[in-house]
Amino acid sequence: MKSARKAAATKTAKGEQTKTLILSTALEMLHERGYENTTMRAIAEKAGVSLGNAYHYFGSKDHLIQAFYHRTHEDHLRASLPALEKESSLKARLLAVIRLKIDTLEPYHEFAGVLFQTAADPHSPLNPFAHAAAPVRRDSIKLFEDLVASSKARIPDDLRAELPYLLWLYHMGIILFWIHDTSRKRARTYRLIDQTVDLLDKLISLASNPLMRPVRKRALKLVTELRDFEAEEVEAN
């Protein structure tokens, strides 16, 4: 019984190693050749595995990219947890999470530029708003839900319900800026993060002011329309 469990564990570990090897090889080749010029056969050959084995772990190049999305999210989540446990203010929590997102993505900066050429297509399954990206998108929004829920900030209930989604959109905008940032050590990106997080924190604080209620309601109505539009696009694709 023990030997059977040991054999199963060894097989699982070997499978994970093979899966990681295929993904790492694919990312390297996608960076070198671009998305269109990289084939599953070429990935398998360079990784030293059979084509059937490559397809066993990843059904297509799209599945490889979704695995990349998932891996970078998991890296970001692990990096963010200590900061979220330490900080209680919304500003400090948001600043840490957004900065750590860029920290964890930085090793893939050049590849991200190549990937963006395909992911920017609204009809591409690699688009962050696409149906195929829904699991990672939900997990990422969940991180922002935890960020908001455990903060000590006073946030109106209607804004609190939509804030995680809005912060997810904000962080996607930061990533887009980072992709195009050629400054040394992405200094412009980090400066943008510092300034915009401070601005967002002030705006969220102002949202509790009774005089801001009509403006807040109108803004949240636009968010609802945006969500409805996104849902329609996902269904259409």
For each feature predicted by the language model, list its residue ranges.
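C-terminal peripheral helix-coil segments that are non-catalytic and often amphipathic
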Residues: K2-K6, K142, L176, H180-N237
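Short, hydrophobic secondary-structure boundary micro-motifs
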Residues: G113-F116, P156-D157
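Amphipathic alpha-helical packing segments from all-alpha helical-bundle domains
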Residues: L126-K152, A161-G173, R191, V197-K202
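Short, leucine-enriched amphipathic alpha-helices that occur as contiguous helical runs
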Residues: G15, K19-L27
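Short acidic, glycine/proline-enriched loop segments that cap or flank alpha-helices
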Residues: R154-Y165, H180-R184
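Helix-turn-helix
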Residues: K2, L21, M29-H63, A67
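Hydrophobic alpha-helical connector segments
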Residues: A67, L81-V114, D121, H131-P135
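Short, basic, alpha-helical segments at the C-terminal edge of helix-turn-helix-like DNA-binding modules
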Residues: H70-L77
